[in-house]
Amino acid sequence: MDFIRLDTADNVVTAASRLPAGHIVETIKTLQPIPSGHKIATAAIPLGGEIRKYAQLIGYASTDIPAGAHVHDHNVSFRNTLSLIHI
């Protein structure tokens, strides 16, 4: 398997190896090359939408993320992360 889905509630999967643009993941095509260990949106995620992995909220879309897109720090916002550092 080229990707790992950790929970059915997730809207991202993790690439198990480097995937080229156009690679089929479930029912969608990757829009760009995806590095091993990075996330791929399995459905469109609107600006501000929740990103879920492990059935847990891991961040919010900082821009509209189309299905098949690479999901990483360039398009994910981690709200309240800074406040946790000071606890």
Spell out what each predicted region is.
Residues 85-87:
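Conserved small/polar residues in nucleotide/adenosyl-binding loops
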Residues 3-81:
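Conserved SET/PR domain catalytic loop and adjacent active-site segment
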